[in-house]
Amino acid sequence: DKALKISKDLRNAYEQDEETHYLIDMSKRLEGLPRHASMHAAGVVIGKTAIDEYVPLATGADNAAVTQFTMTTIEELGLLKMDFLGLRTLTVIQDAEKMVRRKVPDFDITKIDPTDKEVYEMIGNGHTEGVFQLESSGMKSFMKELKPQNMEDIIAGISLYRPGPMDFIPRYIEGKNHQESIHYECEQMEEILEPTYGCIVYQEQVMQIVMKLAGYTLGRSDLVRRAMSKKKGDVMIKERQNFVYGNEEEGIPGCINNGIDEKTANQIWDEMLDFAKYAFNKSHAAAYAVVAYRTAYLRCHYPVEFMAALLT
């Protein structure tokens, strides 16, 4: 329709030539229809009983059973969609662990000390060749600057070292090194942002803010998290009102009713919007940080076994 309005020649052909008219009419009917069916790379649908009791199934690649609905429809129906991704690094860790046990029979990678100073010192010095997520030249430089001292620092580092959040790295490091300079808009914000030195790094922090400050439920806060990460403008306009002023019909008290003034509430919302565009899922980052730390531990204390497993 837009092309017909813009192009006079096309409009004339559409009006005067029967074949052109037919082709354009058919194109309008086809426009927007799914081109083909495909299967999610890692998504697995979980239900209480057999999935075909809830949704129609089809046969996908390699004879796998797939739903005929999209993942958004699946979630709207109340089914659980989980992403299960394979990670070769886990095989490296397993192989290294087997080799270490030849000389330390009771060695268990799941029982290593998560506060080992030697490991953090090695990471902070940038000696991270082979360490999961931390071995690129850019990440090495970041780790030298960050000087991680605990698992929280590694989790934050993995979350921040991505396009977008990287802009907030200087602020994060400044807050870590000079905690007295951090300003919190209210007491509740300090409680939530203290682990990340005043920066909103995780999606879970967005959820905590709307729950603690404005009285959102856990379910409603998750909807806000999704809307912010997907930049749904219309939803955000409505939720700003709910966040600041509350919504009695929907059971949201709002910031003002919780003792936070209008100006401060709006400032917090603006800050959330700014950070939430890039905020990372903490549970994902934490899982990656555990794998990173385990590879770092092996590299630090059992370099021969680790490198042999890595190169095999």
Which residues fall in each region the model found?
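Noncatalytic, beta-rich nucleic-acid-contacting surfaces in large DNA/RNA-processing enzymes
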Residues: D1-T312
